[in-house]
Regions:
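Phosphate-group recognition and catalysis centered on beta-loop-alpha active-site segments
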Residues: 1-243
Length: 243
């Protein structure tokens, strides 16, 4: 098991350190603010039509930017020209994010997925991070993406993003069955990011306690969330305040 103490050494700013006003999520300004405050950075990636890893959460434009097209139907050059509604920032690529961070803090990168078998994003992430020398880890809700990443970039730290929703069948499973599942999970993943609202839960408890997988709680937004993360996880992914 890789030593991932660096991954849980400091609180991680969810989509950068943003305020939903002058500093918008997943923008260079939010990432610069997180670096200045000495937090880790969590960000989201979507694939563009031409196979570039773009730093953006939604699978389509519109919520934060002008336009309404799907990211996977729009080229990287077009996406970089899409104006944010409330800031002068532009959308950036993973490579540009790596240049901005330059190893000054932890990068926790979530690969978004439509669960449709498109594996281009993992390949692009592996290619970009192969030339990056700062601390970085990749995670996804899509277990197939993580399995692919293990195959093409076995040295790249990888983890699963999880929540109770969608796992209700496992919630009632006997402990032995949950132990078997957690063991299989640990074979693919080196850490888990679990919804703090669903903690404590049996699966992350076994993964953390038995298989020693680092556990991050997301997204911590309240005093109660923070208390739960401190008790049941190794670190928090936070938003809306400064820990």
């Amino acid at each position: 098991m890789a030593d991932l103490d660096w991954l849980i050494a400091r609180p991680v700013a969810h989509r950068g350190l943003h305020d939903q006003k002058s500093v918008i999520e997943n923008t260079p300004s939010a990432f610069a603010a997180a670096i200045a405050a000495r937090y880790g950075i969590e960000c989201d990636l979507q694939i563009s039509a031409d196979g570039e890893a773009m730093v953006y959460h939604d699978d389509a434009l519109g919520r934060l930017t002008e336009g309404c097209s799907r990211l996977d139907a729009t080229t990287a050059a077009e996406l970089k020209r899409a104006a944010f509604k409330a800031t002068g920032d532009s959308m950036i690529t993973l490579g540009e994010l790596c240049d901005l961070v330059a190893g000054r803090t932890t990068l926790l990168i979530e690969m978004k997925s439509r669960f449709a078998g498109d594996r281009r994003l993992g390949s692009r992430v592996a290619a970009v991070l192969s030339g990056y020398h700062g601390p970085a880890a990749v995670m996804s809700f899509d277990s197939a993406q993580i399995a692919d990443l293990r195959a093409i970039a076995p040295g790249l730290p990888r983890g699963m993003v999880m929540e109770k929703q969608g796992w209700d069948a496992f919630a009632a499973a006997p402990r032995r069955a949950m132990m078997t599942f957690a063991q299989a999970l640990s074979a693919r993943s080196q850490f888990i990011a679990y919804a703090v609202r669903d903690l404590p839960a049996l699966l992350p408890t076994i993964a953390r306690g038995v298989f020693r997988l680092p556990l991050l709680g997301w997204t911590v937004r309240s005093t109660d969330d923070r208390r739960k993360a401190a008790r049941y996880a190794d670190q928090m992914i936070f938003e809306g305040f400064r820990p």
